[in-house]
Structures are given as C-alpha cells and as structure tokens.
Amino acid sequence: MSDNTGVPEASVETTSVFRADLLKEMESGSQHDASPAGVEGLPEGSALLVVKRGPNAGSRFLLDQETTAAGRHPDSDIFLDDVTVSRRHAEFRRNGDQYEVVDVGSLNGTYVNREPKNSSVLSNGDEIQIGKFRLVFLNGSKEA
C-alpha cells in the first residue's frame, strides 16, 4: 500500500529539460534582447539559468532566492557535476531587481560573456561559464 493521495508532492528540485529550439535560438544569438517563450511566466523577482553547453545541456535552474550557490558539492543549490567545477564555485545574488554572479574562490574561475570575472551584474542573455558548463541568464522582469 502506498500513501499516494493523488496529489503530487511539492519538489524542491528546480531543474528540468528545456526546449531544444530555445537552445538553437540562443546559439544564434537571436534572443539576446527579447525574452523567449516561457520566461514571461517566471515569478516576479526571479530569473532562469539554462545550460547551453556542457553536461545536461537544456537543464534549467530557477534563481528565486537572495543567494543561490553553484558548485560540485552535492548540497549546492545548482549542482554542476564535473571535475572542472569547484565544490563551491560561484554564487548568484539578487540585489533588488538585478542579479550578480560572484566567484567564491574557484580554481578555474567564472566567466561572463567569455571574460573572466570575480563578480558581474548580469543582463538578459548573458552567458556564464562555470567549468565546462555554459549557462544563459534569462531575466523575467521587464528591463528598461
């Protein structure tokens, strides 16, 4: 017997496979200034990271906390399982309606739009590289 009541249990996992056509749009660079379909449904004040290249391409991570940790440690909010990623690699910090990525002492560094950065305020469409992973930042809020 199971205790299944027919109502799915709420999961804290925020990853899922994203549309393949979105990855192609991001590759072509056509979505840098426009929000792709689905982003308008994000909760207010949140943003989305989509894995563009690397293991688990297409996975997405919701940024909906003040600080979201990314790294190879299994307890990381964003678990990036590859030896090129430090256990505590970077943090995504929400400051008002902006997000900032901050390298927290990683061995291989954190890159924003292919430039090494200790910290950087993110704009819609920015590409963040953490080890072998390339993630695209998508902000659901309206930018001026």
Curated annotation (Swiss-Prot):
One annotated Gene Ontology cellular component of this protein: cytoplasm
Protein name: Oxoglutarate dehydrogenase inhibitor
Primary location: cytoplasm
Boundaries of every FHA domain copy: 68-117
Coiled-coil regions listed: none
Compartments in which it is found: Cytoplasm
Organism: Corynebacterium jeikeium (strain K411)
Key words, A-Z: Cytoplasm, Phosphoprotein
Pfam families: FHA (PF00498)
Role: An essential component of the PknG signaling pathway. When unphosphorylated, it inhibits the activity of 2-oxoglutarate dehydrogenase. When phosphorylated it does not inhibit 2-oxoglutarate dehydrogenase.
Domain of life the protein comes from: Bacteria
Gene3D superfamilies per record: 2.60.200.20
List of residues that carry Phosphothreonine: T14
